[in-house]
Amino acid sequence: MSDNNTKPKGLSKSLKYFCGVGDCGFTLMSNIDTFYASYFFTNIARFSLGAITVMTTISAVIDAILSCFYGAFLNKIKPKKWGRYRSWLILTPWLVPFLYAMQFVKITNGLAGAIFITLAMITSRIAWNIPYIANVSMINIAGKTQEERMQLSSSRMVWTSFGTVIYSYVGPAAVAVFAGILGETNAYAATAFVFSALMAAGYYAHFRMTKGYEETGAEEMERLAREAAAKKKGGESQKISTFGAVKCNPHLLFLFLSNISKYIVLFMVNGLAIYYFTYVSKNPDLLTGFLFAANLLSIVASYCAKFIVAKINAKRT
């Protein structure tokens, strides 16, 4: 896995068309939690409603708190061998299949089982959030111009959308296949493991694609040493805090709140879907059609959104 010193010029064909395969795997993986976690806790593991509330609240609060520090962690920690961000595409993703599958392992419906699954939820999210942030950061590193960054972002969104569409059929089908082989109790853990492995493989593909685009750990340390010496001569530059950035750009706060609202509705509707089709409509097979239609409409809405935004901006100017 050693990197040579040759720096690629422009975006490679693999980056242009396959930047996002890891995000496709990430979408497949995370949707197992979105659609089946609550069902597993209540119907398979048979935890009480109070226990589920405590488990999910603890894991969600810790995840929210830690999410505020992942970026700072990556920026402050000593860069690893293959680069500050690129290295994390292979350092922790391989842990995710094991940690994530543990979230869907039934031990007991008592305290021990609740603690085991809660720890699995917390640790699995740490293991996948760090490479997720590093993966997004690599867009600004690999893309040297605004056009290149837009192309990488577009490719990533295409693969993410592709993941949501294929999950509509692959997700429920994988659970059904593993249920027939391993039983329903173990089907969700097996599906989580396989989809997490696909995510890890996709991130490894990103690692290979971005070879040469980011300076290695040794190269960055040399550069930082030179910059530190230059700062001593020229004086310290002014630093802008996160709160200062929000104060200068208040629209960022509204964007943040709108995204939170969007995901609250998304997770609530998707999480309740399996209950509706199982107990209300009495036809669980309809879940596949619902997922396909919802994900397809989300792609159409995302495509139309850029035209709506452009029209609104045109009216303002």
Language-model features: locations:
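Membrane-embedded alpha-helical bundles of multi-pass transporters/translocases
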Residues: S2-A230, G234-T317
